[in-house]
């Protein structure tokens, strides 16, 4: 009988140990799962912080641009004395986080004209981010959006040869079409968020 009692005790002890190990494994799995969730949440928070930091850096860079250039409404303009072809000038503006300047109304055009006079010494004209390269006579901005404001000195008749617009200081800020390979000064615009 003592032997039977010992066997029963041994059986229950083994059963109890098995249950304890099973529960321990389940708890460890749950703990690992919670830990992974926390790690995922932490990674999400870190990613969000990096995005915010990058956004702040962009805003700081724009403020620097505005300090060196001029601010008009929700745009900053920055002029460059170096002469470039239309495409090179636009690529340079894009590399800096903007585009060639695109006046959307007469107020912007006049402000851009005045800023160009002040900042581009001895220059009578500079590139605008406007062209009709794709469809002759249909002027679009450098993003491909149709232009709704126009300030032409004369109706562009440059044909396939003159496809890029520039602002002419001598004609009080009127636009003229020009050969895109011409070397001109330029002004970049940056949208302020």
From Swiss-Prot:
Keyword Disulfide bond: yes
Family annotation (SUPFAM superfamilies): C-type lectin-like (SSF56436), Triple coiled coil domain of C-type lectins (SSF57944)
Pfam families: Lectin_C
Cleavable signal peptide: 1-24
Record localization: Secreted
Cystine residue pairs: 66-76, 93-188, 164-180
One GO MF term attached to the UniProt entry: carbohydrate binding
GO BP term (any one): ossification
Assigned keywords, A-Z: Disulfide bond, Lectin, Secreted, Signal
Residue intervals of the C-type lectin domain: 72-189
GO CC annotation: extracellular space
Matching CDD domains: CLECT_tetranectin_like
Chief location: secreted
InterPro entries on file: C-type_lectin-like, C-type_lectin-like/link_sf, C-type_lectin_CS, CLec_Tetranectin-domain, CTDL_fold
Keyword Secreted in record: yes
UniProt-recorded name of the protein: C-type lectin domain family 3 member A homolog
């Amino acid at each position: 009988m003592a032997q039977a009692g010992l066997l029963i005790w041994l059986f229950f002890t083994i059963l109890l140990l098995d249950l304890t190990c099973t529960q321990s494994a389940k708890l460890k799995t749950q703990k690992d799962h919670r830990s992974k969730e926390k790690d995922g949440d932490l990674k999400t928070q870190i990613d969000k912080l990096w995005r915010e930091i990058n956004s702040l850096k962009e805003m700081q860079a724009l403020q620097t641009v505005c300090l060196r250039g001029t601010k008009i409404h929700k745009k900053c303009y920055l002029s460059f004395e170096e002469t470039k072809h239309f495409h090179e000038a636009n690529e340079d503006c894009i590399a800096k986080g903007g585009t060639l300047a695109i006046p959307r109304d007469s107020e912007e055009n006049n402000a851009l004209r005045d800023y160009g006079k002040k900042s581009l010494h001895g220059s009578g004209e500079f590139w605008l981010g406007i062209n009709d390269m794709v469809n002759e006579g249909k002027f679009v901005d450098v993003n491909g959006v149709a232009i709704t404001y126009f300030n032409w000195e004369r109706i562009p008749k440059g044909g396939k040869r003159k496809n890029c617009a520039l602002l002419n200081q001598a004609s009080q800020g009127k636009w003229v079409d020009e050969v895109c390979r011409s070397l001109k000064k330029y002004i970049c615009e940056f949208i302020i968020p």
